[in-house]
Amino acid sequence: MSSSHLPSVDKLLRDPACQPLQQRYGRQALLATLRDLLDELREPARRGQLAALELSEAVLAGRAGERLATQHKSRVRRVFNLTGTVLHTNLGRALLPDEAIEAITLAARYPLNLEFDLATGKRGDRDDLIEELIRELTGAEAVTVVNNNAAAVLLALNSLGARKEGIISRGELIEIGGAFRIPDIMARAGVKLHEVGTTNRTHAKDYEAAINPRSGLLMRVHTSNYSVQGFTASVATAELARIAHAHDLPLLEDLGSGSLLDLSRWGLPKEPTVQEALRDGADIVTFSGDKLLGGPQAGLIVGSKALIQKIKKNPLKRALRVDKLTLAALEAVLNLYRDPDRLAERLTSLRLLSRPQAEIRTQAERIAPTLAAVLGESWQVAVTDALGMIGSGAQPVARLPSAALCIRPQQPKRLRGRSLRQVEEALRCLPIPVLGRIDDDALWLDLRQLDDEPAFLQQLAHLQEELAR
């Protein structure tokens, strides 16, 4: 068939099969897709490589529809996080509770008093929406919020220590994900790094000896994403605050994960809390909103009213501020902390972190037979004890007792790697991608975070199709 037998774009646009596509995707998108499709087919058609049926209006409309569906498919995809890492940075960290989701919906749909004082009828400050609540929960004098904790650290350093020295222990010069390094952030903030002590041991006398007329602040960083054990020494917040205040210097403490409550109450490892840092004398404390706090991505800066005011006057503050959706979600999450007795029931991240191993194992035993039937006799599916992680740099050596579906190919060890990669890829290609981890010649699906069991089971039928490709 020659290219002259290709239908014209106008003819395709008028074809009944294309009308639903035009309604759904718009005329311009359909037109561009049809032109691209016809351009690709013109040469094969000229050479007679295509049958008449392949060039029919119905077939071409179908191919255009497939392309348009792919083009318009959202890149933001829901996934099943069965990796065993609860606050997974690459998978969005904390899952928000229903109260926060409802607050976001209202804030997105309607105008709100973001920077408007309803009492006076004048312009307001967006921090006012959550300041009183955070002060109540932390005991801080004042509060400001930016878009993440890295921004909080940058803003605080630049506001309090620009063109001066920042004194910090060598053992706290951490790097977290995305090449965020404390020395680099200090340099960007205009603060000259003055490191003291050694990697494993730093003493109060090291800070004392480092203070000089060029000193701008003392900084303490909670090393939440790694642990130095053995012959170690560090200076507690209270002692460091005493040293700083004796020389009229502020103490900035970066808590990173930012817990507001003692997590050991729910059987989790204890993390230093914001309240403890402030009570021990830290003038400014920074922490994340989407890690242990269980809220949206945000960086919270709390502490001295005078220093917070100085931070808020920094022109960088506007560049780093949060939007209405973040503030709405953050307020809703923080409100849950007013009732700590019910927090594990209502705060999604805490509920998942504290989920009992026995409950997870029961769920795994319920699902295992179905998954085994889908995979067939060439695979072994076993319910196995597992050890998960909190994630997002919190308590790196702590493990969460859990249970997993351990998928192992029934073949010689030298052949297992390829088979495991195939099933891992097939799970990622499901309508709701399933993400696990490969370890010890098996694919592990840790079920700690499997909330929607019906949706997981419903799509297992597609797994056979993906494996057959």
From Swiss-Prot:
The modification N6-(pyridoxal phosphate)lysine is found at K291. Its main location: cytoplasm. One of its GO terms (biological process) is selenocysteine incorporation. It is found in: Cytoplasm. Keywords: Cytoplasm, Protein biosynthesis, Pyridoxal phosphate, Selenium, Transferase. InterPro entries: PyrdxlP-dep_Trfase (IPR015424), PyrdxlP-dep_Trfase_major (IPR015421), SelA-like (IPR018319), SelA_trans (IPR004534), SelA_trans_N_dom (IPR025862). Signal peptide: none annotated. Pfam families: Se-cys_synth_N, SelA. GO terms for cellular component: cytoplasm. It catalyses: L-seryl-tRNA(Sec) + selenophosphate + H(+) = L-selenocysteinyl-tRNA(Sec) + phosphate. Disulfide bonds: none annotated. One of its GO terms (molecular function) is L-seryl-tRNA(Sec) selenium transferase activity. Its EC number is 2.9.1.1. Converts seryl-tRNA(Sec) to selenocysteinyl-tRNA(Sec) required for selenoprotein biosynthesis. Belongs to the SelA family. This is L-seryl-tRNA(Sec) selenium transferase.
